[in-house]
């Protein structure tokens, strides 16, 4: 501003350009005063006034300065007071006049400098003014916001007060309702108890009634059996009486004849003829005797034959009433008869008796006279294979062999139905539907000759029919002749009328395939059932063919050349020239075309040029092939408009081509299997072109002379030679089209002849020529699936987006027929996916309508490349879409290409692709559509229906879960475990399941789902084994066996929002989770803070009931000690119980304190007393008890002597009163008395399995909680913990027991149990391990090696050192009494080292490696990581040099066989009698160590005798026995337990002492046996006689460096005693044999 003001002053001394610059600068800084507000104008005025004042002051100062300077220059140039002036004076005096400069500058320059300074100050002031203005504006805005916030705060405070009042009212109402509901609950609980009691009573009554009913049923069945037996006996007697009656009648008639003869003889005698009657009488008598004999023996046989035939006709009506039962395959338990057994076995009356109506006597005769060989209908095989109604089929039997089945009473109810001829699953006209269009006379002849059910079919089997009455030899001969004649005619007719069978491997060779399991493609005719003779007139009307009828095959026939009769135009046939015709499979729809397979190899003999064969289609049922269509070569039925139908469609097509046509089910490029090229070449060479079939003529004979027609024929047949010849002719129209508009290129593309298409395209045929329906060659090739033709046509610039008359594009047709390769080529060519038909359908609709998943995936995800330069250019990898990956996670691999508008496009009816997929039940297609994020499943059609409304059940479920949220449910264990129980062993949170929350899910459903998930999880982790939640094996009770249920839940967090079961919010669960971004549901269990132990139970897997019992013991008895093997969670349990007690006492209003003390070896009783006093647990006698609760936890008490530490405190702790004080002796000789008050609780932990020595004196003063490894809670803790760990890895799911993770976990559990079992047998309880060390077992799905590596680390760091220490401590109890335990451990002898290594090796093989889930090769790689897995044999052999006591005898160290000592493992040795040598003892010990086959007491020692083992060990140690030898024997007996057969599979056979084989599973082998070869049980030799041989064989093998042979045979439990007795005999042999064995072992070393 000052500058502006200054510039307004006239200054004539300035240059003109300076004035112009100042004017421009003033113009720039000028602003509009009118726009300023009043306050701004005031401020501007004040600023301008200040500047004016400043300008006046400056002017005055300048004037004064100018005056002063003028005076100074004129009058005061020289002033002595100023040295500057003196210097100036000298300067002026010393220089010339011209060189002198003025003393001061021009006043105008000074004025300009002052004005420049004023300008700068003006600029600074302006910037400061603008900043001040902006700050003022911000301050005003903040004031306004503050006022608004204050108003909102007041409003919210008022609302809060209102809500508080409402909430208070609601809370009061809820309290009242809760009280009412609690009363109701109690009433309902009482009612429920009453109802349950009544239910139990009713169950008991029902059980008694069921028992009575079962007893009555048993009685009734017994009575029925007795009645059946009596009836059978009565039937037998009746038959016998009938036979006897017949014999008697015959005898009576004979006697009557004899009487008549006697009368005649008497008359003759009377007449005087004495000689002749006397001679005839003996003959008659002789005849009479022979007749009587024949009647008695042959009568019943003749009658039995009559019984098979005569009553059959009478009982037909009766039999027809039976249920339809056609047994085809006899039961597996029926006995078999050899093939040479005759069929006329004498029947038994009780054999094959039916359980049906027994009133008619002829029915019984039918059954009683049945032969034991079943009728052929039982194993009947029709001419074309097994019958369609039979559940299974038997292979055909040869004619010379009788059916090898005998009917037993087990199938008696079916035998009568087998004998009944009228029951069959076939219809009388079942075969008529299979050959429509044939001559009725041929069908009638076939029907007639197949009508005889007794005729054997081509497989040599006969069907059952009523036997003929005439059994004379002449009738039988004629019957055989008739059968042969009918069989011959039937075979000829069957070959003529049925489609030819597949090519046999050898003409005339029998079929070796199993007809019942995999039927080959065969003839489709069915043989008519064998019923009574049918009238041989015309056959019954032909029923329509059923699509679901499974057509049974027939064995292949030799090639038969059938020549058609030219005069018979109505019969269909085909001329076959050494080609095998294959019928389509029976599962294809009607009208399948019959295709030609590969030509059989031609014979070397010269033949005429082959004529092209004609493919005929089997016409649909009910419509025969017309005479014109079958007799004329060029017949072509009218085709329905459009190419929407696949190659195998319902329309009947006759396509003469020698190329196997590709059906829509399995499209194959026809160009890759051109089998008729040689035929076509021969045809072209021979000039026999008129026989080529014209393809494109619709009815009538084809004009065979036209060249365009020949061109189309050659293109249709794929005759490249003829086509090239025709294309070389001049004047030929290659674009000629027939009446349907089909060009030669169209025909070649439709039939997939790629070479023909290439020739025509090179000849410049029109690539986009359309037929009368608008289809181009590309449309035809895409519809038929000829992707090679499609690729070729696209390369020649065919219109890929051409739409037919109905709007179908090539892409649409390819999607409709599911031609994947064609779709890929079209998409890569850049075809439009959004072209719509007249009906509004897109290719997406077509693909979904066909249910083709691959086509839909290609449409949605296949990206077209940027450009394709040439035909043979490879596809870029970016455009390739992996169908398999796309199915799993298409979003992860690529995003959908098609937009949301196309996926949601609706047709004329309003249906989208989702509607079509849902209505048809195509769940896979619908799932792919749902993965598109732009899908609108709520889109409605014109009938206002969504896809969900028209969907099937599966698709409805999919749509309902479309937008479902998968929220994991986790359980938090509450407090983290103290000390070394860190997060490595105890997971903070465990996933139990994932909830699917849908939009329609209510809070009630959500609460039920959470509760059910918790219940299922608790039951799953506490169940035995790996039982899935879906098995239904869990109880319906809410509590699990560990005591947890939904009542154990403290709170639930939905993300970060607290929620309680049954609580509802205004929003639905789905909206609530979405809005709050809740990613998980966390369940918190009640813990010690609430005075509960549920969280402790879940964290430690100790049952809640047991923890509550422990807590009750502490609260009731005040003094409790927890003891068990190391790692039994004693410290954790004690600490959690202390926390729970503390919070309970605090909730009751008491103050409580927990004092933890870790005891070590230097902890004295004085320090313990100070701890009691400082924690106010011990108070002076004069002081009254206080209300403070004190909980003292003493940990690691096993490190000190309990009797020394607690000896003085035992009485005061037990009697807590002033009468039983504890006296504290002070240093000055004074003492003070203290006592324990009732509010003090003492808990201790001991990591020791059992107490010994003086520590037992403390036992009676405390309550002891023993945590045994083989009892609860420790026994089930580890399985439950690891099962929960596995479920957490599998996100709450229980894997199948076959899963490798389950096997690995089971192996870890087995290691812990077997290890402790073996250590208990060894008598080393100090080495027992609790489950704590195994809680860190890694659970890595698919990587069992991680668990084995972890086991190796655990073995090397924990298990092996403990075992080594325990074994050394036991072996050195008597060895070095003077040195003590530490000296023995620090300097173990050589024998002790050997024993330790033996123990480690045995434990490793028996307890750790046994049952390892790894393969043998993988396990061998990890065995070296285990310490003690193998040790050198020299160390063990030096064990022989160890000195023994002189009184020890080898003879008395042998096993005693007295009955009194058989029950123990080892009888105490007697030292009274001296032995002949000590070498036998040494030999026996080392031989038993090296060759466990000599372990005499191996198999009868089991794991149940731990107590006797301990007693025996104590006795032997007390008698001064050699502890090392005892340990070796104990190790050996442990090694030869029942699981040895399994150990031998795991142990490495190449290590000398890793495999300990027992005599129960090692047979005698020679030295040449392959060690890997399994041995059959037949090769096992008696153990008693071959035991020395086994030892010598194993010795020789080890000397030769060959690994020892291990047996893989299991040891039956029943043979354990036998084996042990046999080995006893061998081990009790002379010592010389043992010495020899020892010598062998030395040589080996």
Swiss-Prot record:
UniProt cross-references to PROSITE patterns, sorted A to Z: ANK_REP_REGION, ANK_REPEAT
Disordered: annotated span: 1-28, 269-293, 366-435, 451-478, 492-612, 868-898, 1442-1479, 1551-1645
Main location: cytoplasm
ANK repeat copies, ranges: 706-736, 740-769, 773-802, 806-835, 839-868, 909-939
Biased composition (Polar residues): 407-417, 451-477, 580-590, 1558-1569, 1582-1597, 1635-1645
GO-annotated cellular components: cell cortex; dendritic spine; FAR/SIN/STRIPAK complex; glutamatergic synapse; postsynaptic actin cytoskeleton
Coiled coil start-end: 119-276
Keyword terms: ANK repeat, Cell projection, Coiled coil, Cytoplasm, Methylation, Phosphoprotein, Repeat, Synapse
Residue(s) carrying Phosphoserine: 1521
GO MF, one annotated term: protein phosphatase 2A binding
Biased composition regions of type Low complexity, renumbered to the chain: 1620-1634
This protein's record includes keyword Repeat: yes
Modification type Asymmetric dimethylarginine: residues: 495
Pfam families in alphabetical order: AAA_lid_NAV1, Ank, Ank_2, CortBP2
Compartment(s): Cytoplasm, Cell cortex; Cell projection, Dendritic spine
Its biological purpose: Regulates the dendritic spine distribution of CTTN/cortactin in hippocampal neurons, and thus controls dendritic spinogenesis and dendritic spine maintenance. Associates with the striatin-interacting phosphatase and kinase (STRIPAK) core complex to regulate dendritic spine distribution of the STRIPAK complex in hippocampal neurons.
Quaternary organization: Interacts with CTTN/cortactin SH3 domain. Interacts with STRN, STRN4/zinedin and MOB4/phocein; this interactions mediate the association with the STRIPAK core complex and may regulate dendritic spine distribution of the STRIPAK complex in hippocampal neurons. Activation of glutamate receptors weakens the interaction with STRN and STRN4.
Protein name: Cortactin-binding protein 2
Gene source species: Mustela putorius furo
Gene from which this protein is expressed: CTTNBP2
